[in-house]
Amino acid sequence: MKNIRNFSIIAHIDHGKSTLSDRIIQICGGLSDREMEAQVLDSMDLERERGITIKAQSVTLDFKASDGETYQLNFIDTPGHVDFSYEVSRSLAACEGALLVVDAGQGVEAQTLANCYTAMEMDLEVVPVLNKIDLPAADPERVAEEIEDIVGIDATDAVRCSAKTGVGVTDVLERLVRDIPPPQGDPDGPLQALIIDSWFDNYLGVVSLVRIKNGTMRKGDKIKVMSTGQTYNADRLGIFTPKQVDRTELKCGEVGWLVCAIKDILGAPVGDTLTSARNPAEKALPGFKKVKPQVYAGLFPVSSDDYESFRDALGKLSLNDASLFYEPESSSALGFGFRCGFLGLLHMEIIQERLEREYDLDLITTAPTVVYEVETTAKETIYVDSPSKLPPLNNIYELREPIAECHMLLPQAYLGNVITLCIEKRGVQTNMVYHGNQVALTYEIPMAEVVLDFFDRLKSTSRGYASLDYNFKRFQASDMVRVDVLINNERVDALALITHRDNSQSRGRELVEKMKDLIPRQQFDIAIQAAIGTHIIARSTVKQLRKNVLAKCYGGDISRKKKLLQKQKEGKKRMKRIGNVELPQEAFLAILHVGKDNR
């Protein structure tokens, strides 16, 4: 056990985590040069296309150190985006140490801090690594000072490497072996294994990634899931060297995969403890704290026949992504679907793409909303995650919106622009600290504004230099209203949005104008209105298509023309009474862009 090292690689987006993992795999001979490819651990097509890591991946390698000993390295490559920070904290729970990778050109950014603090809270040994020293813009001395100044860990002798060229990566491994402690645990005690991650394989059923904390797990053992009390047979187990390799046992301190022929998706939840059925452990390991979704949206299959397969797909996906929340929902405009909760807009986009790709579904998404806390006049507190569930205005005593605490790190030059943006987003400044050339800003901004497009606009006002990390702080009373959209005097529930009263006029007008461009013209006028309660705040009309009924009157009497026009008018009236309007998918997506164009 003393030769096992478990560690994660954490860093801000694009600081070179996945490339560093590639080099480590190559040096330790996990894959031959022929099988090697860039970002070998990003196995999902979506990850490769976007060049980001979405799922944490684990690998077991052997490394012969300079002291002549051979060490077993179990390491986990983690995502860098704020939306996937839950993946990071789960990966860290399986480790004793973390490599904090910092780009020697960019320096410390917001996620660097957030991930590093997560690791420190779990009492992990953090080893700083300066990456990308082959870049002409690299300034390792300045960045080492920044790490000490902002993060507060000693970085004077931080290892310098370039994951792309492979310079200094061996030094990183030597430092790892020296600084990260071996796993603790009792190899002879009763088995306790923590499920870090699971996914669904069509042939094997549920595959789980486990970290053995105490005891040993052997092939063929009877294994008990502690939360459900169900027992299974350990059919196959092994490690990833990125490839799946079968083993006969997993020893104390190791990380590996396990197949127990569990067909039920809820059979082995992430964060659960496995123990042996013969000699069970007394208590379960502390799991992970459940994360609360920040953004909710309705997902509906385009054709209602897909509802069943959509439900199965969500089940399989939620096994792989424990932060996804869903419950059935029906809408008069869109039929049956699910209300899903996500950690952020990127997460929502990724889930939608994965459902469409991996499970071949066509989906319509409604506008994302955050959760509001509503106190009714009957003094009940309810949580509303969809505008259609908001009680009528006269039943609401107080409506509170979620406030996010946003930590931003940016160069001084962009401070003015960023502050202007935060004020526009109804933000309140709570802290500002200068670190050399960098400024650390803390603002409290309503979550609804953050999830809309705050991140994109922060990046564009600061030319990509600012970085953001946010978390939910509290609920705060505020003057929010629901803007309904009426089409031919009928409310369309899927188009409603909740917004601040100050913005409601402009948002309503903008939404109505957008809808006017998107709804195809019909044989009769379509009135599109935005309303708060019964008060109409904006209207526009999609003009009817009409035939020129006077074309056949050559010259002719005015009363003849009037008669023909009158007859056409009557016909249109009748049509309008029975006609219904089909809304295209783009119309539902229009809400996503409300408030984005008026920059």
Curated annotation (Swiss-Prot):
Gene Ontology annotations of biological process type = positive regulation of translation
EC number(s) per entry = 3.6.5.n1
Q: Which domain of life is it from?
A: Bacteria
Q: Where in the cell is it found?
A: Cell inner membrane
GO molecular function of the protein, one example? guanosine tetraphosphate binding
Keywords from UniProt, A to Z, are:
Cell inner membrane, Cell membrane, GTP-binding, Hydrolase, Membrane, Nucleotide-binding, Protein biosynthesis
Which reactions is this enzyme annotated as catalysing?
A: GTP + H2O = GDP + phosphate + H(+)
Q: Which residues form the tr-type G domain?
A: 2-184
- First-level EC class: hydrolase
Instruction: Supply the InterPro entries for this chain.
Output: EF-4, EFG_III/V, EFG_V-like, EFTu-like_2, G_TR_CS, LepA_C_sf, LepA_CTD, LepA_IV
Task: Give the binding site residues for GTP.
Answer: 14-19, 131-134
CDD domains xrefs: EF4_II, EF4_III, LepA, lepA_C
Q: What does this protein do?
A: Required for accurate and efficient protein synthesis under certain stress conditions. May act as a fidelity factor of the translation reaction, by catalyzing a one-codon backward translocation of tRNAs on improperly translocated ribosomes. Back-translocation proceeds from a post-translocation (POST) complex to a pre-translocation (PRE) complex, thus giving elongation factor G a second chance to translocate the tRNAs correctly. Binds to ribosomes in a GTP-dependent manner.
Q: What is this protein called?
A: Elongation factor 4
- Lineage, top ranks: Bacteria, Pseudomonadati, Pseudomonadota, Gammaproteobacteria, Enterobacterales
The gene designation is lepA
